């Protein structure tokens, strides 16, 4: 009986390790919403990292969040570093591409609670009636340790729910 239990445990562990090993080595999380405002009104809220305080879901998770800005106020080269509690972590982001009223691409470097180097992207598409479809995506490599963690935690749900909240906040800020 004891040997059977040990065998089942070993098989389960090997199954988890094997599943993580064959999982994709890149990830992409994406959410979309429509905002009743033109791209020219939505774009500055994304392209100016100082404006993120008004809508980023992570800003509200740590009232004592430490922020620092560097580079230009907005657009390519604008950077934002943060240091916060366990929910927010520590990291840096820098705008690497900025196409007025159309696209913002950001290099994301997380140091804590885990190290990761990803890309975030905002695409703005004008819609009929003066509204804007905004797509917020994050993508990057998924090393083995992250894939192993994803066996137990659905990162798309965890991060995607924050993107949903952020897009709702962005919508509220842009529609004022």
Predicted segments, located by residue:
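Hydrophobic ligand-binding cavity/cleft-lining segments
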Residues: 3-72, 76
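A generic structural micro-feature
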Residues: 23-25, 72, 85-87, 112-116, ...
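Short, surface-exposed coil-to-beta transition loops
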Residues: 28-30, 88-93, 116-121
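Short strand-connecting beta-turns/loops that link adjacent beta-strands
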Residues: 38, 87, 100-101, 127-131
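Extracytoplasmic/secreted envelope proteins and their assembly/folding machinery
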Residues: 39, 43-52, 77, 92, ...
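Sec-exported extracytoplasmic/periplasmic mature domains
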Residues: 47-57, 85, 97-103, 168-176
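Short beta-strand segments that buttress and anchor functional surface loops
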Residues: 78-85, 105-111
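Beta-strand/loop substructures that line and gate deep hydrophobic ligand-binding cavities in soluble
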Residues: 96-97, 107-164, 170-172
């Amino acid at each position: 009986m004891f040997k059977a239990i040990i065998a089942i445990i070993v098989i389960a562990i090997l199954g988890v390790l094997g599943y993580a090993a064959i999982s994709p080595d890149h990830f992409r999380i994406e959410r979309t919403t429509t905002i009743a405002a033109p791209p020219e009104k939505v774009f500055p809220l994304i392209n100016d990292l100082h404006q993120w305080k008004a809508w980023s879901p992570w800003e509200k998770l740590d009232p004592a969040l430490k922020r620092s800005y560097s580079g230009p106020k907005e657009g390519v080269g604008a950077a934002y570093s943060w240091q916060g509690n366990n929910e927010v972590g520590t990291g840096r982001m820098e705008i690497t591409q900025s196409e007025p009223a159309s696209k913002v691409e950001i290099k994301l470097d997380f140091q804590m609670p885990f190290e990761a180097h990803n890309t975030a992207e905002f695409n703005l598409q004008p819609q009929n009636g003066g509204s804007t479809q905004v797509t917020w995506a994050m993508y990057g490599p998924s090393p083995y340790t992250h894939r192993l963690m994803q066996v137990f935690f659905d990162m798309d749900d965890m991060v995607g729910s924050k993107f949903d909240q952020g897009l709702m906040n962005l919508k509220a800020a842009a529609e004022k």
